[in-house]
Amino acid sequence: MGTDITATSEWQALARHRDEIGETNLRQLFADDAARGLRFAVTVGGLYIDYSKHRVTAETLNLLVDVARAAGLETKRDAMFSGEHINTSEDRAVLHTALRLPRDAALTVDGQDVVADVHEVLDRMGDFTDRLRSGDWLGATGERITTVVNIGIGGSDLGPVMVDQALRHYADAGISARFVSNVDPADLVAKLAGLNPATTLFVIASKTFSTLETLTNATAARRWLIEALGEDAVSKHFVAVSTNAKLVAEFGIDTDNMFGFWDWVGGRYSVDSAIGLSVMAVIGRERFAEFLAGFHLIDEHFRTAPLEANAPVLLGLIGLWYNNFFGAETRAVLPYSNDLARFAAYLQQLTMESNGKSVQADGTPVSTATGEIFWGEPGTNGQHAFYQLLHQGTRLVPADFIGFSEPTDDLPTADGTGSMHDLLMSNFFAQTQVLAFGKTADEISAEGTSPDVVPHKVMPGNRPTTSILATKLTPSVVGQLIALYEHQVFVEGVIWGIDSFDQWGVELGKTQAKALLPVLTDAEPPAAQSDSSTDALVRRYRSERGRTA
């Protein structure tokens, strides 16, 4: 049987503390401690992380750390970094942290020199992208490649597309990237629009080279290329990120242009592996190395810092605090940077696929709520969409605000005297302030507001936020941000006793889709389905496609 964390004395002490502090108000917490904004903050690498606007006291944090220790967080953290098989349902090591180890590090797992393997692939990626960026690699007609189209899904898409947008200012070799993931043909058609086959390179990202959506899109892309340039062009315009040399070769890709990765890398943790090939093609191997160094900086902090001063630990524990003791089900991620527009979508997979589990690692039911629903949009777009609910709604939604002191782009304000970036960041600081402290009925009445309107204008405040401030959005900072959330996921998963590194919940739907495809397409009318809803939907679909229902 797995450990029931809720039965421990540490958890029960935390539950009593929750009852004692009740709805402790942030106004009062700041009034009681003039230095709270400085004391409840930590600087790690390029990230200044302010967690003072949370409903926590020093005692809360101490009790949360006690729970983490009761769950064996430090031991399990060390087990992950050393390559033990902590993914128990698949009997695998979990070594995404090895992807960013420096060349002189040492790590042997299951008899294999992991660091040497990682850097062999990174070197091959670097050599290939150097040729691509310099124009040494030419397409079938002798023209330079100007567009890389990454075809993948899930972790083979969400990471690269997010990082590509985040680091668009570091594109410096005349190469741009597009990303195709959805098996809806509209995705591929839109991404191929306006492209010249002679200057386009496809990266097919599939570990097994058998992922249905990816191979369907890859085959359609191959057909598009062959129609323009002929069969022999495939080897000059397709490369693979895969471990299945046989299927890669059968597709027409030279296996010398196949870049591998390992079973100990989960898809949602793989953007810093060969899955990042499209990113490296755009920003270059040196910037990609900076990206990896950012991950490693946070890895080392997480591995070595005391739990009480460990940023991923503290943020993971605070997330658990709201999830399990306040009934909060979601967390908003609100980057005040349009270049991080895809960050919330990336975190959705990272967090929800990892911790969306209802059984513990040993198969027994969990004893408390697990997983956070991540969502969000860049500021200030979100302010004009859903912040109303954050400020005055009945649901508690903790939020992470991410901002930068230096802009990647800046323009003057309407009157020509100010900076649009300053305007953006004034909203960042104002929103966290208003969410925390609100505005009372007395304060609103004192402004001469009509009594009938006062209740509608009251801002209750006491809405929790984390503020993450960095100097600038650089490759290193992007790596730091990703690793910060990766390790939060681990912290919460350990305390809940779940396996954060499998994803069995996505498998049954894939199997069922394969079974249903011929039901949709066969010439003969289908047999009755196992439920009346699916049966009616299938028959309506067939009828509207002109097939016998």
Curated annotation (Swiss-Prot):
GO terms for biological process: gluconeogenesis; glucose 6-phosphate metabolic process; glycolytic process. This is Glucose-6-phosphate isomerase. Residues 537-549 have a biased composition (Basic and acidic residues). Its EC number is 5.3.1.9. Disulfide bonds: none annotated. Belongs to the GPI family. GO terms for cellular component: cytosol. Catalyzes the reversible isomerization of glucose-6-phosphate to fructose-6-phosphate. It holds the Pfam family PGI. The keyword Isomerase applies. One of its GO terms (molecular function) is monosaccharide binding. It is an enzyme of class 5 (isomerase). Its main location: cytoplasm. It is found in: Cytoplasm. Signal peptide: none annotated. It catalyses: alpha-D-glucose 6-phosphate = beta-D-fructose 6-phosphate. InterPro entries: G6P_Isomerase (IPR001672), G6P_Isomerase_C (IPR023096), Phosphoglucose_isomerase_CS (IPR018189), SIS_dom_sf (IPR046348), SIS_PGI_1 (IPR035476), SIS_PGI_2 (IPR035482). Keywords: Cytoplasm, Gluconeogenesis, Glycolysis, Isomerase. HAMAP family: G6P_isomerase.
